[in-house]
Amino acid sequence: MKILTFQHKDILNELKNKGVYLANINSFYKQQTPKCYNTVFNSIKVKEPGATQPIFGWKKVLNKELIVDSETIKRCLEMTYLEEDEYLLFELNIDDDKVSLQNFYNFVDARCEEEGIDPYYENFEEFPIDTIFEIEDGEIQATFSSIRKEYIENVYSYKKINNEYEITKINF
């Protein structure tokens, strides 16, 4: 399955040195919304030993299949609020059974509900958690437990110039 993921520049060195990157930190977001993170992590059929939380990426953006272009990068950064100078774009090919797909907006709704931000339901248990897996349309996020060197098809840096992103392929 083709996936795009934005990862901190340090991840590239970890992949070069170790051959694999695992999400085994207790991130701020996982601490704030552990039920949502555990739900998507547990939905991954085949997990890398040692991984403790999902890595996030994209399967579909702007309601179309992925291509590495300025429009796709702009939309992904709008949704994730990443610091563009600190991240690289990884184009991955991962076996389907190692990936779980979710509707980005339904996942965000679930996180907001769990965190108590503008709650619609009286408690998180009332939130229809299965809606995060409704992926017929929209922005589709992908979660997986590791990035292995062999998953990487391309790595790109990007820089915003005049409201467009200049994309540079990095030799890996």
What would you call each of these model-derived segments?
Residues M1-T52:
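ADP-ribose/NAD+-binding catalytic cleft of ART/PARP-like enzymes
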Residues D10, G19-N24, A51-Q53, N63-F172:
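Conserved NAD+-utilizing ADP-ribose enzyme module
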Residues I44-E48, G57, L66:
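Compact, well-ordered interaction domains used in eukaryotic information-processing assemblies
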Residues K60:
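Conserved catalytic/binding loops enriched for acidic/polar residues
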